[in-house]
């Protein structure tokens, strides 16, 4: 793929305008007030469905509590992760199962709490877009995988400073 960056992978997006992109998979976790609490740049692309449970555990380690709600897109869904998340104490698991034929599951995915979780997830997609546009995550200017991790980390820190400043400004008015 790249002579200069041999760690680069092809990421199949399936979009009509850009079906393939090049880079690494970056996972972003966001909490209240649009603060990114964790990010990870993967050396090799794992299946999205294997990432959900570790995200809940990272949230618990960093913030000292299990999240009340977990929202993710359908790629993160697996029955095992959903059951394990609920066993850990997550009250609402808003992760759609697009392949379901169960009427019970379809009804669950139309409940208010599930839809609120998916709206939150849509907002998190906006955070990714902001990181790409405002903080230059479209293209990494540092060489190597460690350079990419550093580049993403600096973008996350910069965005968190902006979000904290906005939050404090709202509190003082």
Across the structure, where does each feature detected by a protein language model lie?
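Polybasic low-complexity intrinsically disordered regions
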Residues: 1-74, 82-84
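Structured core elements
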Residues: 2, 27-29, 38, 71, ...
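Short, charged, low-complexity patches
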Residues: 48-49, 150, 154
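Short, polar/charged, Gly/Pro-enriched helix-capping and turn/loop motifs at alpha-helix termini
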Residues: 66, 99, 168-171
